[in-house]
Regions:
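Flexible hinge/capping segments at coil-to-helix
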Residues: 133-149
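Periplasmic-binding protein-like
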Residues: 48, 125-132, 195, 199-242, ...
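Sec/Tat signal peptide C-region and signal peptidase I cleavage site
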Residues: 23-30
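Extracytoplasmic small-molecule ligand-binding "clamshell" domains
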Residues: 31-107
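Ligand-binding cleft/hinge of the Venus flytrap
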Residues: 54-58, 71-80, 157-174, 202-206
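Short helix-initiation/N-cap motifs at beta->coil->alpha
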Residues: 68, 83-94, 136, 153, ...
Length: 276
């Protein structure tokens, strides 16, 4: 009898561990899409100091921009409220991985290195890195191969500088306005960022006549929505909505609001959002 009791106790313990393990496995594989819908809100990491992608509106004090309009469209598709989480380039992925953000919609370039730690949607924007320099400076990119160049921490531009110009001195800043201040003060001889961000930055600068954007590209880059690794259901919804925005013409309308001919940083739209 004692042997039987011991056997039953061992079996019950094993079943308990199995059940607990099953619960833990289920929790580990929790569907973030379902969690977002249950919470009724999607938290989106976006910029608040990088116009025209994301910046503070001086009148409303709301974050507005190209990325914000896409975030609004995604929240509408999910059927939940939108909560914007202000970020800078270096904090984008940590916010996502820590659960403080559900999505990254913050001008984040798709790279193999980043794709190892987060998943990316199909690109919803295509851009390139350029240089902003004093108006009387050299016009060729290679003329800055040994210069002091400002970049934003955690960006592909920062990485591209080290690869393209290993003899340059790269100084990193938390955001692009700080980099521009360094350029004004003569601490750096050039700064680099996405072409569209530089155009928006220069358009708003009171001393814009003192600077110019060099025509050559440091790199060509595709921008996607960042999703936590393995959240396939959420990623599929994001991709479906991005493609739908293109098909309905709404993606082009959003682009025109921020980059159209009437804007401070006009640029022709040379891409389409396509399923991959």
């Amino acid at each position: 009898m004692a042997t039987h009791k011991k056997h039953y106790h061992t079996l019950a313990l094993a079943l308990g561990l199995l059940t607990t393990g099953g619960l833990l496995s289920t929790q580990a594989l929790a569907d973030q899409l379902a969690d977002i819908k249950a919470a009724g809100v999607v938290k989106v990491a976006t910029f608040d100091a990088n116009p025209p992608f994301g910046s503070i509106d001086a009148k409303t004090h709301d974050i507005v921009g190209y990325d914000v309009d896409f975030a609004k469209a995604l929240a509408k598709k999910l059927g939940v409220k939108l909560e914007l989480v202000a970020t800078n380039p270096a904090n984008r992925i940590p916010l996502l991985q820590s659960g403080k953000a559900d999505l990254i919609v913050a001008d984040i370039t798709i790279t193999p290195e980043r794709a190892q730690v987060i998943d990316f949607s199909t690109p919803y924007f295509v851009t390139g890195q350029q240089f902003l320099v004093p108006a009387k400076s050299a016009d060729k990119l290679d003329d800055y191969s040994k210069a002091r160049i400002g970049a934003v921490k955690g960006t592909t531009g920062e990485q591209a500088l080290h690869q393209r110009f290993p003899q340059s001195r790269v100084l990193s800043y938390d955001d692009i306005p700080l980099a521009l201040t360094a350029l004004r003060n003569g601490n750096v001889q050039a700064i680099t960022q996405d072409s569209t961000i530089l155009a928006g930055l220069l358009a708003q600068a009171p001393d814009k006549a003192d600077f110019k954007i060099l025509p050559d590209l440091l790199s060509k880059e595709e921008i996607g929505v960042g999703v936590k690794k393995g959240e396939i259901a959420l990623l599929n919804v994001v991709n479906d909505e991005l493609v739908n925005l293109e098909k309905t013409g709404n993606a082009a309308k959003i682009y025109d609001v921020w980059f159209g001919p009437q804007t401070a940083s006009p640029q022709p739209r040379a891409f389409k959002i396509e399923a991959q």
